[in-house]
Amino acid sequence: MIVDAHAHLWFAPSFSLDEFLKWTTKFGIDKLCVSKLTPTRPSNISGFTEANRDVAKAMKDYPERILGYCYVNPCYEEEALKEFRRCLEEHNMLGLKLYTDCRCLDPRVSPLIELAVEFRAPILIHTAHLQRRYIGALQPFHGNPLTVSTAEEIGDLARRHPKATFIAAHIGGGGDWEWGIKALRQPGNALLDTGGTGVDLGMIEMAVRELGAEKIVFGTDNVLCAGFAKIYGAEISDKDRERVLGGNMMKLLQRRGTP
């Protein structure tokens, strides 16, 4: 069983879900855990609500393949919490997706975490540790890179909320991956996903060595070739590879009670 813990729905006409599913089938992915972001950030209430509707529709259209994360902007506090609860109760979404709308240690995130704990729902957080010279280049895309959460902050968050399960997103797409891995060594409830375009030699091996394979989940962030190459090319045991590719995420899905 191969589970992609970090995938996205994007926007037509450049993205076709049917076409994307064909490619994921060719790569052998059994289940996709997807979220949809808004075209511009920070997102507003109508934006993230519409994005979640699209995810819910995809789940309904492809119930055997697609599971959904609820994406919200925590800055909208009450409305964000209401939307997250709706996604959990009405659509049985697997968890919460947080992006760059605010940093993960913002107090407004705490009620969302408490709700996630209630439903045993994992929390996937966009993560990066960027060198200063890259910040300006990323400005047009991220809107405000100063609100990007770091692995160190996620580790801190995990210690504050020991009953929650956090996933630090795309270790291969967040800048200094070695720093990120080291920051997640201590808390047992903070995992990382392997997504991103980075395929640096030794990245996956270091993650397994420092964190243990049980704290790593496979993610592509829709970058399929690089996503698989770094896992199959890594010098790790077959047992650890199986855990990363799907075993660990299946445990989270079973704990949540999603198909």
What residue ranges belong to the model's regions?
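Divalent metal-dependent hydrolysis catalytic cores, especially in the metallo-beta-lactamase
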Residues: 7, 12, 19-42, 66-73, ...
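Mobile, glycine- and charge-enriched loop segments
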Residues: 1-13, 52, 56-70, 185-188
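Active-site environment of divalent metal-dependent phosphoester hydrolases
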Residues: 10-13, 39-42, 74-78, 103-104, ...
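Catalytic pocket-lining loop regions of alpha/beta-barrel enzymes
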Residues: 94-95, 109-215
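Active-site gating/metal-coordination segments in enzymes
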Residues: 46-134
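Mid-to-C-terminal alpha-helical segments outside catalytic/metal-binding sites
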Residues: 1-8, 16-31, 85, 206, ...
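Active-site neighborhood of phospho(di)ester-bond hydrolases with catalytic His/Asp-centered motifs
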Residues: 2-5, 33-36, 69-71, 97, ...
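Conserved, mostly hydrophobic/aromatic
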Residues: 6, 24, 55, 59, ...
